[in-house]
């Protein structure tokens, strides 16, 4: 009599396990590296959160009343990556400006933690509709950059591509074509211009196409008014959704906060809706500890929600962001003497793109009876029909994925 799990099946299973062990990548082995402490790496994630909010405040002061959107993990990772190619003084300057010295971790451990945090994000891509990537393009004639190349590939989940920067126009085309291909045409013409003496280009992106679900299947989409401010109103698709959400009041921010967990992906999405006329105050008062306190106070409740469909996209040259953070010199021939800095004496380009869309899950709208039935119960009500702030982080390691201000949800 043959058992349900035969000896042939057992041998096949053993063979597959051996094959998996043999074909483990370096990245998988690094993920199991006992020297990587997830608890310590959460300190790095926390630091990224704090630094990104500081950066957001400075961007808000300079941007007027428009949208702001960037990916903290992608922006800070790109800047931290540059320290791999720097001598001790410059590397220290970059990491201290990013406040990583306050984690108490050695430089090597900080870079390992970036690998760990980025790896955790990449693992969610198949189930979360999240797409992210990083590529470094370096001039083909450069030498003495082995440490930089090795670190970029192994620690920052980045492709390393050697190209000829002599013809900057052709180099720009090659970079844009490569990124368009690896992003499956989701990212087009990410680099707008290159200086003629460019030797290095760092390009990264993050895309999240989120879908809003409902515990009860109560959802529909209607075109309604959205108030931009200053007496201006536009028509936008508004998702009407009844579901269990987190809705609470933050008094010292003069704001109502909605946290959604019913979006695709293991992410926490915070919408901070300032009271009328309080946006500027909220932006300058916001700190990351606010979010930590919010999470401790979360209580779920039935919410009658109207939220605009979002279609947001912004591209940032990181040189200006580094300046806002206080990183005043990178690869400057007058201040560095390492092999990398002796070689890299020209211009460099660092670009980060963030794309965020949120729409309704499924194409079949709910019937009015669904809303009427649930509408008879005690519930919170929230209309996101005016500008708000948005902050998105993963639940596993608290990595900040997106941070921004939404004035026009269809920009």
UniProtKB/Swiss-Prot annotation:
SUPFAM superfamilies: Serpins. It holds the Pfam family Serpin. Expressed predominantly in epididymis where it is found in the epithelial cells of the caput, corpus and cauda epididymis. Induction: Expression decreases following castration. Administration of testosterone restores expression levels. The record marks 376-377 as: Reactive bond. It comes from the Eukaryota. PROSITE patterns: SERPIN. It is found in: Secreted. Its main location: secreted. Residues 1-25 form the signal peptide. Glycans are attached at residues 50, 89, 101, 164. Keywords: Glycoprotein, Protease inhibitor, Secreted, Serine protease inhibitor, Signal. One of its GO terms (cellular component) is extracellular space. One of its GO terms (molecular function) is serine-type endopeptidase inhibitor activity. Inhibitor of serine proteases. Murine alpha-1-antitrypsin is represented by a cluster of up to 6 individual Serpina1-related genes. The precise complement of Serpina1-related genes present varies according to the strain of the animal. Belongs to the serpin family. PANTHER family: ALPHA-1-ANTITRYPSIN 1-6 (PTHR11461:SF32), SERINE PROTEASE INHIBITOR, SERPIN (PTHR11461). The reactive center loop (RCL) extends out from the body of the protein and directs binding to the target protease. The protease cleaves the serpin at the reactive site within the RCL, establishing a covalent linkage between the carboxyl group of the serpin reactive site and the serine hydroxyl of the protease. The resulting inactive serpin-protease complex is highly stable. Variability within the reactive center loop (RCL) sequences of Serpina1-related genes may determine target protease specificity. This is Alpha-1-antitrypsin 1-6. It comes from Mus musculus.
């Amino acid at each position: 009599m043959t058992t349900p799990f035969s000896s042939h099946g057992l041998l096949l299973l053993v063979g597959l396990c051996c094959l998996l062990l043999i074909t483990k990548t370096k990245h998988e082995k690094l993920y199991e590296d006992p020297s990587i402490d997830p608890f310590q790496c959460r300190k790095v994630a926390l630091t990224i959160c704090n630094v990104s909010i500081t950066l957001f405040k400075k961007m808000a002061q300079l941007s007027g009343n428009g949208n702001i959107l960037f990916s903290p993990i992608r922006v800070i990772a790109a800047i931290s990556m540059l320290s791999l190619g720097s001598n001790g003084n410059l590397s220290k300057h970059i990491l201290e400006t990013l406040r990583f010295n306050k984690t108490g971790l050695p430089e090597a451990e900080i870079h390992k933690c970036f690998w760990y945090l980025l790896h955790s994000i990449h693992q969610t891509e198949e189930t979360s509709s999240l797409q992210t990537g990083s590529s470094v393009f370096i001039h083909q004639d450069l030498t003495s950059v082995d440490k930089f190349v090795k670190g970029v590939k192994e620690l920052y989940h980045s492709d390393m591509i050697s190209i000829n920067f002599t013809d900057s126009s052709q180099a720009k085309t090659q970079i844009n074509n490569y990124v368009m291909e690896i992003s499956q045409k989701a990212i087009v013409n990410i680099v707008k211009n290159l200086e003629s003496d460019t030797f290095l280009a760092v390009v990264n992106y993050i895309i999240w196409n989120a879908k809003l679900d409902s515990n009860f299947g109560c959802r529909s989409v209607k075109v309604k008014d959205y108030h931009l401010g200053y007496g201006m109103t536009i028509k936008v698709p508004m998702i009407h959704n009844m579901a269990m959400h987190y809705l609470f009041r933050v008094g010292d921010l003069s704001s109502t906060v909605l946290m959604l967990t019913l979006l695709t992906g293991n992410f926490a999405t915070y919408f901070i809706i300032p009271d009328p006329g309080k946006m500027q105050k909220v932006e300058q008062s916001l700190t990351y500890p606010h979010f930590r306190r919010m999470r401790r106070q979360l209580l779920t409740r039935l919410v009658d929600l109207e939220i605009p469909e979002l279609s947001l996209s912004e591209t940032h040259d990181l040189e200006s962001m580094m300046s806002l953070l206080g990183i005043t010199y990178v690869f400057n021939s007058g201040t560095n003497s390492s092999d990398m800095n002796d070689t890299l004496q020209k211009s460099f380009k660092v670009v980060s793109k963030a794309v965020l869309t949120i729409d309704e899950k499924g194409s079949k709208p709910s019937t009015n009876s669904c809303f009427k039935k649930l509408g008879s119960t005690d519930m919170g009500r929230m209309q996101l029909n005016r500008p708000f702030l948005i902050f998105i982080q993963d639940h596993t390691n608290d990595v900040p994925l997106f941070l921004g201000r939404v004035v026009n949800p269809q920009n």
